[in-house]
Amino acid sequence: PGVLEELLRDHTTGKNIFWATNDYEEFGKGYDFFSQITVSAITDENERIVRPRVLKSKENQTGRSKNMAEVFTPSWVCNAQINLVDHSWFGRKEVFNIESLDSRSWEATTVPINFPEGKTWKDYVRSTRIEITCGEAPYLVSRYDTTTGNYIPLHQRIGMLDRKLR
């Protein structure tokens, strides 16, 4: 299977994950609450169906929060938390970026990553990280800022996978 097929698969049931919302019913058969999400349902002419929370209406966001307990974590918070994990692993701060908590932003470091004695980039890539925040994608990959919807340039991304690829 391809990457997208793998991402859509529920590894517990062996089936694809399902929509778990009625928000997409207007698109017809295969988009109701219990329908499995297929590659064709979200690609080609359907590629704009799934959108970041920040691009949805405020009414939709509020409704999903109230009715489905949907929450999101601002990108700057994800960054701060991942930086704490990296501080522990590297034994120092500001390895991948320099945070500005006052402005809720960060600036990527530009120098090559210096690994602690006895550790290599391979050790970092192989190091286990666990994302336990109910599927918060920004902790893994940060394509866009979750609060503004603005695209994050590749060199500024803060997710765990982003860092390992860097």
Where are these regions (language model features)?
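Class I S-adenosyl-L-methionine
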Residues: 1-166
